[in-house]
Amino acid sequence: TVALVSDAGTPAISDPGFLVVRECVRNGIEVQCLPGATAFVPALVSSGLPNDRFCFEGFLPRKKGRMTRLTSLQEETRTMIFYESPYRLVKTLTQFAEYFGAERQVSVCREISKIHEESVRGTLTEVIAHFQANEPRGEIVIVLGGKENS
C-alpha cells in the first residue's frame, strides 16, 4: 500500500502528483482517491458566481503561452478558476481586466480554512484597487465570472 500526500491541497490538482498516478495506472496498480481538501471548491461555492458549470485552469503559464491561454478564454461562458501567487496577483488581475473587461465579476479567496481567510468580491477594477492598497498574502484562488451571453 502506498499513500500519495500533498502538503497543500489535493495531490495531482495543480501538482505533479498526476505523474505518479499515471504510472500506477499504466502498471496496473489500483488507485483510490479519498475526498479531501481542494481549495477551489470552497472558493467557487463562496464566490457568488454561477457554479453549475465551471472550468478549472489552475496556474496560468508564467511566460510562454500565457497570452495565448488568456486569448483562448475570452469567449468562455463558464465560471473560470485559477490559482495564483500573491506576488503575481495584481499583475494577473490587471491582465484579466485587459482581456476580459474591467467590469467582469471576480472573487479572490485567500488562506481558505485558515485564521486569515478572506474573500474579496466585485468587479476586476474594484478587486485590483483592493489588492493595490492591501498587499496580498498566502495561497490564492481567483474565481472569474464567464462571458455573459448577449
Stretches with model-predicted labels:
Residues 19-76:
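Class I SAM-dependent methyltransferase SAM-binding "motif I" and its flanking Rossmann-like core
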Residues 6, 33-36, 82, 108:
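General beta-strand structural signal in soluble alpha/beta enzymes
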Residues 15, 43-45, 67-68, 92-94, ...:
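Short, well-ordered secondary-structure micro-motifs
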Residues 2-9, 13, 80-84:
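Acidic beta-strand-to-loop metal/phosphate-binding motif
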Residues 11, 38-41, 114-115:
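Short gly/pro/ser/thr-enriched loop/turn and capping motifs at secondary-structure boundaries
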Residues 10-13, 62-63, 116:
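Short, small-residue-enriched loops and turns at beta-alpha junctions
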Residues 79, 83-150:
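A contiguous loop/helix-start segment that scaffolds small-molecule binding in enzyme catalytic cores
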Residues 3-7, 53, 107-111:
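Short beta-strands and strand-loop turn motifs
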